[in-house]
Design a protein with these regions (language model features):
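An N-terminal boundary/leader segment
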Residues: 1-55
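Flexible N-terminal pre-Rossmann segment of NAD(P)-dependent oxidoreductases
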Residues: 6-9, 65-72
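Generic hydrophobic alpha-helical segments
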Residues: 16-20, 60, 159
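Alpha-helix boundary/capping residues
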Residues: 20, 37-38, 63-64, 115, ...
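Short acidic-aromatic low-complexity motifs
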Residues: 23-24, 63, 77
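Long amphipathic alpha-helix in the N-terminal Rossmann-like dinucleotide-binding domain
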Residues: 54-61, 116-117
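Short glycine/serine-rich loop/turn segments
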Residues: 70-170
Length: 170
């Protein structure tokens, strides 16, 4: 997977979707490459608060909607949009061990899935999603991939880190 994985690292979502549509790559290959990058980079950068790699691999191996982004891996921000069965904390310390579990996908998540996107997990946000930096006490800071001593900003700091480092295209 080396050549494909390297090619995907900074390929945008439309390029990745085109690889699937042309048969040059499968959704499973896209997901595996993204998971490998996340596992390699996230320990130092701290973009994610939760992963759902097994579920993503199962989805990618099965039938996906024939949407414009079929097979493209993505991450949800840990606020507002929800996916069924996932625990949400919204960056809040008091929800770290008492997180709300979503009974269903939010409308936005349903639309993402209908477009063919494959959910790999959720990204860090500041506590209450209101700080200009993503440094939640509950999970530690997200780090700028170009200068780990700096914040990627907020409230989408974890998402910014994931895209800027090539973990996922969206």
């Amino acid at each position: 997977m080396g050549d494909l994985s390297d090619r995907l690292a900074f390929a945008d979502a439309t390029e990745q979707a085109a690889l699937v549509a042309s048969g040059e790559a499968s959704p499973a290959e896209l997901v595996d490459a993204a998971v490998a990058r996340i596992e390699r980079l996230d320990p130092a950068l701290g973009a994610l608060v939760a992963e759902s790699f097994d579920q993503a691999r199962a989805e990618a191996a099965g039938e996906l909607p024939d949407g414009p982004f079929r097979g493209v891996p993505f991450l949800l921000k840990d606020a507002v949009q929800h996916s069924a069965g996932d625990r949400y904390q919204h960056g809040m310390t008091f929800l770290r061990d008492n997180a709300w579990v979503s009974p269903e996908d939010s409308e936005l998540t349903r639309r993402y899935r209908a477009a063919g996107l494959v959910l790999l997990g959720r990204t860090k946000v500041p506590e209450f999603t209101i700080s200009p930096t993503t440094e939640p006490l509950a999970h530690g800071p997200a780090r700028n991939p170009w200068d780990p001593e700096r914040s990627p900003g907020g409230s989408s700091g974890g998402s910014a880190v994931a895209v800027a480092s090539g973990m996922v295209p969206v």
